[in-house]
C-alpha cells in the first residue's frame, strides 16, 4: 500500500508574530484546510521581516516541498518586504505587475500614491491565481503562493483557489482509551510493526474522567486503515476502549 501525498511548507512572516504582538492563526487554518485536501504539511517556519531571511527560507522550502504558502509582509509599509525577499531567494527581480497596478488605480482613483502602488510589486515571472473571483488575486511564483497576513483575507483567498491542491484524502479513526500510555504503548508498537505505513498518534488527555488517551489512526487507503483498526481493537485489553470516531 503506497499512496504518495503532496507536501507543503508554511512560512509565517512577521516581526509582530515573533514579538507576540500578534498571535498567528494562519498556520492552523492552512494545516487544517490542507489536511482536508489530502496535502501533508511537513514544516512551519516563523521568521522576521528580513529580505535575506525570507529569501533563504522560501527558496529552501520551494526545493523541499510541492507547495509553499507564505503569509504576511505584502502591504504598503516599510516593513512589508516579503515580495523582495522571495524575489531575492529565487534569483529574480521585483517588478510591477500591470494587472495589479490597474486594480489599485481603479480602486483608489486620485488617491493612489507610491506607497499603495508597492502592493503591485511582485517577483518577476509571478502569475495571478483566482482572478475573476477576488478583488486582489493570489500571487504565485513557481510553487510558492503568497498570501497576506490578515486571517480573514487569507481565508477568503485560499477558499477560492484551494481545489487546485486537492489530492487523495486522508481517512481517520480516533480511539479513546481508558488506559494510560504506559499500558498501551506496547500494543501501539506492535500495530506499527504490522502496519508500517499507518500514521499513528497517541495523545494523553489529562482533564477527562472518561478516557486517558486519544489514539489516532490515519491512512489514504481506507481498507488498510480498517484492517489496522480491527487489529488494534482485537489486541487491546478488554474494556480499554471508551469510544471510536472516524470517517
List where the protein language model places each region:
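Conserved short beta-strand edge segments in small beta-sheet-based binding/regulatory domains
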Residues: 235-247
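Glycine-rich phosphate/diphosphate-binding loop of Rossmann-like nucleotide-binding domains
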Residues: 2-44, 49, 223-227
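An accessory alpha-helical subdomain
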Residues: 142-235
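N-terminal small/polar loop signature for handling phosphorylated ligands or for N-terminal nucleophile
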Residues: 28-80, 85-88
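Proline/glycine-rich low-complexity loops and linkers
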Residues: 53-56, 80-165
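Short glycine-rich or small-residue beta-strand-to-loop segments that form or flank ligand, phosphate
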Residues: 10-13, 18, 67-72, 144-146, ...
Amino acid at each position: 500500500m503506497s499512496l504518495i501525498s503532496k507536501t507543503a511548507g508554511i512560512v509565517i512572516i512577521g516581526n509582530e508574530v515573533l514579538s507576540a504582538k500578534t498571535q498567528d492563526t494562519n498556520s492552523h487554518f492552512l494545516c487544517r484546510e490542507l489536511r482536508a485536501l489530502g496535502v501533508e504539511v511537513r514544516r512551519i517556519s516563523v521568521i522576521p521581516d528580513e529580505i535575506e531571511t525570507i529569501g533563504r527560507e522560501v527558496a529552501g522550502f520551494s526545493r523541499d516541498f510541492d507547495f509553499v504558502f507564505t503569509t504576511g509582509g505584502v502591504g504598503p509599509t516599510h516593513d512589508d518586504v516579503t515580495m523582495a525577499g522571495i524575489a531575492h531567494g529565487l534569483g529574480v527581480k521585483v517588478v510591477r505587475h500591470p494587472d495589479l497596478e490597474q486594480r489599485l488605480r481603479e480602486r483608489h482613483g486620485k488617491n493612489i500614491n507610491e506607497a499603495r502602488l508597492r502592493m503591485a510589486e511582485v517577483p518577476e515571472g509571478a502569475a495571478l491565481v483566482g482572478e475573476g473571483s477576488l478583488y486582489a488575486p493570489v500571487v504565485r511564483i513557481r510553487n510558492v503562493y503568497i498570501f497576506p497576513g490578515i486571517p480573514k483575507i487569507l481565508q477568503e483567498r485560499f477558499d477560492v483557489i484551494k481545489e487546485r491542491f486537492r489530492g487523495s484524502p486522508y481517512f481517520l479513526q480516533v480511539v479513546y482509551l481508558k488506559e494510560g500510555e504506559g499500558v498501551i504503548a506496547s500494543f501501539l508498537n506492535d500495530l506499527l510493526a504490522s502496519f508500517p505505513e499507518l500514521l499513528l498518534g497517541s495523545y494523553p488527555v489529562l482533564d477527562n474522567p472518561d478516557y486517558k488517551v486519544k489514539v489516532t489512526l490515519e491512512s489514504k487507503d481506507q481498507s488498510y486503515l480498517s484492517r489496522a483498526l480491527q487489529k488494534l481493537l482485537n489486541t487491546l485489553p478488554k474494556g480499554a476502549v471508551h469510544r471510536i470516531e472516524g470517517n
